């Protein structure tokens, strides 16, 4: 991809502080060798997540001043609903404080609806790949999360356009194995974060929806990075090069019945989420009832009016093709620099992050010693860069057996916040990892000193294995 400059001017800056290695060693020990627990002031470049860490535009900042903080019926809520209907095509909208808020009010209602119809005796959700909080909400509601992403996603070296696709044969086999009556929902994750921020093709989304309709299974589109997915469809899928991003998005959402969204990603707000419905007004009403005690009144869902206004504006800004070309190009630039330096990554790069294959880079560290987390710590010590593990540590234990779930990949995610860092930062990141590669065999595995029972990677404490 041709490297292009940022399609924006910088109006405000935030100073960041470089620390020395001695300071970082002390900070990492205090954090229990878990970068999630590091204070942000001890981090030079923060690649932990792209969720809520982007820079808002001048229009979004102006929108904050238009906040209507009425408890009920805020005008910003109605603006948000109008934007969702116009841009996504769904007429029923519930705002939430973030994506997991949408999941916590939706999933119990989906299970209850299935059980009311006589099904879901052994409830399961099927996805191309559940992300961590999504799987946690499934399991906390007594259901099982099953991933059926294409096997091509697990060959990080080989190029394939659609490493976020469902394995359609495996999807059909899973429905047959558990019985359609037990499948509460199919969750289409766009883009597929856990396989490397990889896109799912329109043809795959269409076929998944056709299979779901055959079995009367509702489809939820997990929509955190829907704009990036639409950009990949425009670039790679035959028949879409002449369509606008907005046209592609409207078609994508015809292959779902409802959506959950962490609006902290593509819509570029610091807080916010959505739970929206295409036709099922009865389910919408059930979820709204649950929203009130869990998230807040139905016209604010845990958000201030000003935050809903920024979200309504950001929904459209995130669809800007020039911005998406720059944004995904920056991720690709970092990926190509790393590949040129001999760092194994999930190839091709996805939309929001570069995923380093720690299993290849650190073959001496077994999965049960969390190689990607070990690399995460080493990168922080090397250069003050915080990233995040996507592998065995994140995947966790089977809630029924207590055994570690086998992770097909051990990835270190270098997540690029939107409109925050320049390509000079990307060069610094690449130089640090390439330098670290020459000493990779010195990196040691990790073991727990404290392991939480749910979503352990957030607050676990570890120590190096000597």
From Swiss-Prot:
What are its cofactors? pyridoxal 5'-phosphate
**Record flagged with keyword Lyase:** yes
Sites of N6-(pyridoxal phosphate)lysine modification: 265
Q: Pfam families from the entry? A: Beta_elim_lyase
Q: To which pathway does this protein belong?
A: Amino-acid degradation; L-tryptophan degradation via pyruvate pathway; indole and pyruvate from L-tryptophan: step 1/1
What's in the keyword line of the UniProt record? Lyase, Pyridoxal phosphate, Tryptophan catabolism
Q: What is its EC number?
A: 4.1.99.1
Spell out the family assignment given in the record's similarity comment. Belongs to the beta-eliminating lyase family.
Name this polypeptide is given = Tryptophanase
Q: What is the species of this protein?
A: Yersinia enterocolitica serotype O:8 / biotype 1B (strain NCTC 13174 / 8081)
């Amino acid at each position: 991809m041709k490297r292009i400059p940022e399609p924006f001017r910088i109006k405000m800056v935030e100073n960041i502080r470089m620390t020395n290695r001695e300071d970082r060693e002390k900070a990492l020990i205090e954090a229990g060798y878990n970068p999630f627990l590091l204070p942000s002031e001890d981090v030079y470049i923060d690649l932990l997540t792209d969720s809520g860490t982007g820079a808002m535009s001048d229009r979004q900042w102006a929108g904050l001043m238009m906040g209507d903080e009425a408890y009920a019926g805020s005008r910003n809520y109605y603006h948000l609903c109008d934007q969702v209907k116009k841009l996504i095509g769904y007429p029923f909208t519930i705002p939430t404080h973030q994506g997991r808020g949408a999941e916590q009010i939706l999933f119990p209602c989906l299970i209850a609806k299935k059980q009311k119809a006589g099904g879901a005796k052994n409830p399961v959700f099927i996805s191309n790949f559940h992300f961590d909080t999504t799987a946690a909400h499934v399991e906390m509601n007594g259901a099982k999360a099953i991933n059926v992403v294409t096997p091509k996603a697990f060959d990080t070296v080989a190029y394939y356009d659609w490493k976020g696709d469902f394995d359609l044969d495996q999807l059909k086999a899973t429905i047959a194995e558990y019985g359609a009556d037990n499948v509460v929902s199919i969750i289409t994750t766009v883009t597929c974060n856990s396989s490397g921020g990889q896109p799912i093709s329109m043809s795959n989304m269409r076929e998944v929806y056709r299979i779901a309709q055959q079995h009367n299974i509702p489809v939820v589109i997990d929509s955190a990075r829907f704009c990036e997915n639409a950009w990949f469809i425009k670039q790679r899928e035959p028949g879409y090069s002449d369509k606008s991003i907005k046209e592609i998005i409207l078609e994508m959402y015809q292959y779902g019945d409802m959506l959950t969204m962490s609006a902290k990603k593509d819509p570029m707000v610091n807080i916010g989420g959505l739970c929206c419905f295409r036709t099922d007004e009865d389910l919408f009403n059930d979820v709204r009832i649950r929203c009130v005690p869990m998230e807040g009144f139905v016209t604010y869902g845990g958000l201030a009016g000003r935050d809903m206004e920024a979200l309504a504006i950001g929904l459209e800004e995130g669809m800007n093709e020039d911005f998406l070309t720059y944004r995904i190009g920056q991720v690709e630039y970092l990926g190509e620099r790393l590949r040129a330096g001999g760092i194994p990554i999930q190839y091709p790069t996805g939309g929001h992050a570069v995923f380093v294959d720690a299993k290849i880079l650190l073959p001496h560290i077994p999965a049960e010693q969390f190689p990607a987390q070990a690399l995460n710590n080493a990168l922080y010590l090397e250069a003050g860069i915080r990233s995040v593990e996507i592998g065995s540590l994140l995947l966790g234990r089977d809630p029924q057996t207590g055994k570690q779930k086998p992770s097909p990949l051990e990835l270190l995610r270098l997540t690029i916040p939107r409109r925050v860092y320049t390509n000079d930062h990307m060069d610094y990141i690449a130089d640090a990892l390439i330098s670290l590669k020459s000493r990779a065999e010195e990196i040691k595995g990790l073991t727990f000193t404290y392991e939480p029972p749910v979503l352990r990677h957030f607050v676990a404490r570890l120590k190096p294995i000597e």
